[in-house]
Amino acid sequence: MPSLSKEAALVHDALVARGLETPLRPPMDELDNETRKSLIAGHMTEIMQLLNLDLSDDSLMETPHRIAKMYVDEIFAGLDYANFPKITLIENKMKVDEMVTVRDITLTSTCEHHFVTIDGKATVAYIPKDSVIGLSKINRIVQFFAQRPQVQERLTQQILTALQTLLGTNNVAVSIDAVHYCVKARGIRDATSATTTTSLGGLFKSSQNTRQEFLRAVRHHP
């Protein structure tokens, strides 16, 4: 994987080793993003025409190009590790050894089964070892992995593994609560249910007190 940051390469390798990487085929050839957009727009044009939509209408004529740009630059940008966030780690000179929690991180992803929205929030916690991470970097890591076709269970574990790898500690916990529009907008059409997934590592798994402290933070209980 050329031209990747050290952190991006480490995270990718860790996910592959654990069988947690998003299913990706080896590229047939190297395509730049503009070529990808052009090809996607062409296929989207065919799909819309098969749906009997009139692409000569001024409301629809740019839709294939808008969708292609959205896929490559926005909602599926996390498929490209060149977009992995720049990571800031700080030596833990303060000797912080208590739980650090970032709660209610906005999360918007896409269901890989139907390509419709997953909308929710994530809570991430870790117990520092040798390093602490810039807080906004946790949000960016969540968003990076959300910007892929996903299943929520894998997304939760990808975030956990990425942070364990970068921070050099197993003491990480991730919880995601989300609404799946493949459930809300089609099929069963259940507008009120939500899905919660949790992935725990290190003390968050082995220590009942640490686990309960994290779960109280997830539930916003004092």
Swiss-Prot record:
Transmembrane segments: none annotated. Allosteric enzyme. Activity is modulated by K(+), divalent cations, UTP, and tetrahydrobiopterin. Tetrahydrobiopterin is an inhibitor of this enzyme. The keyword GTP-binding applies. InterPro entries: GTP-CH-I_C/QueF, GTP-CH-I_N, GTP_CycHdrlase_I, GTP_CycHdrlase_I_CS, GTP_CycHdrlase_I_dom. Zn(2+) binds at C111, H114, C182. It catalyses: GTP + H2O = 7,8-dihydroneopterin 3'-triphosphate + formate + H(+). One of its GO terms (molecular function) is GTP cyclohydrolase I activity. Its EC number is 3.5.4.16. GO terms for biological process: one-carbon metabolic process; tetrahydrobiopterin biosynthetic process; tetrahydrofolate biosynthetic process. Pfam families: GTP_cyclohydroI (PF01227). Toroid-shaped homodecamer, composed of two pentamers of five dimers. Belongs to the GTP cyclohydrolase I family. This is GTP cyclohydrolase 1. It comes from Salmonella typhimurium (strain LT2 / SGSC1412 / ATCC 700720).
